Amino acid sequence: MPASTARRLRVAVLADSDTRWKWGALTAARISSTEFTETTESTEKSDKTADSDIRLDGFLLRGRATPTVRQLKEIGVRADSLREVTAVEFLREMTKETYDVLVLALVGGGVQAMLHGLAHAWQGRPERPVVVTGYVGVVYEKLADGLLLRHGADLVLANSRQDAERFRAVYEGVGADASSVTEVALPFLGGAPYEKKDPYTVVFAAQPSVPETRKDRSYLLDRLVRHARRHPEREVLLKLRSKPGEHTTHIEELPYQKLAQRHDLPANLRLVYGNMGEVLDRTDLLVTVSSTAALESLHRRIPTVVLTDLGVREALGNHHFVGSGCLASWDQLDAGHEPTPDAEWVARQGVAAGSTPSGEGSYATAFGEARERVAELLTTGELPPLKPYYTPVTAPGYLPGVLARHHLAPDGSPLPGAPVADKAPGPVRQIVRRAARGAYRHGVQRVAPVIRRMGEL
């Protein structure tokens, strides 16, 4: 926002998981505050998100992936207020409070439900916030589905030039307004440029749902163990996203912690948690299947490998890295291979500022267009009603189900009996809620794999 802004902006973020809260809160700061125009230090290591330019109110959508206290602490992003809400409770809050900017950091169906719910809640209201949404990382699946579910926001953020081109093509291809697509970058990139460490440290960034099968996940763990034994002079870290019983953006049926119990791990191999930026501070080689951590690593010019052992496949997401120069196998890594990323490919992903021959891709200015668009919309006065592409006319067999999952009718109004919490839950309700979540996670991580294996007999 312009430095001349006379008052502190009020910004709200609604998120449904730990990673989306991190993306949403940091995005809100970057598109609303001049404090983030020039940044060289890691944003992940700083909790300076709710700075003097904005008041940030966080809302965590109640569900299977609602972040735990530990996960929120690990992210390290500070807000002026943060509380858990149901979808209907959040919509009610949006009719009581006045915000300048609202960031919807949700899965696609959640964004669509909130857009329709907000359109209904704000009927006849002369003013409303600028509504922003986007993606938390690499977009490698369900491109059309996810994009059309996000259509209707004032800004649909694309994390790279490549994504912006793809997003506009999808919207224009179905006859939807593509003017909302705005190119930015991932908001959590940063940190000091890479310098070789002693001891040399290899980090495998695990993912909750990729790969999916026990066989493939066991294979990757076995290769990591073999690499550690082959290179006893190296420190080898298995970077885990969540602890057993916790959920993140994706469901993890087979945690690596559980698989690791069957191994006699070498002394130089450790399982670690914590902030990804802090782990990258001590990384010499980042290895992953397709994690967004690869982009964080590339931004800091850390040698980065995207594994090909299980194939280069859309189901794994590593097809996104074709042309990056980072594709390699464990056999190559065991032999000492270090990849050299393609500068043009990296620049198109919105990372590694100034790494291209032409000097394009400045990360410091990556959010300038979004800030300008937000400022322009805030000064236009009354904004038009939200108009998503999906309506009861364009998607009569799809939209009602998307909205019903969030207890909303096809017109965006709350369904009868929709859960709403007008006050903080009492001790009994908190115990019941924790038990219900525990039962769900037990079903996902214990019962579902057994049933799946029985079905394969």
Locate each region found by the language model.
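C-terminal amphipathic helix plus adjacent low-complexity
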Residues: D334-L457
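Active-site and donor-binding regions of nucleotide-sugar-utilizing enzymes
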Residues: L9-T34, D47-K48, S52-D57, L61-D177
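A short, charged/proline- and glycine-enriched loop
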Residues: P2-V11, D53, Y194-V202, L457
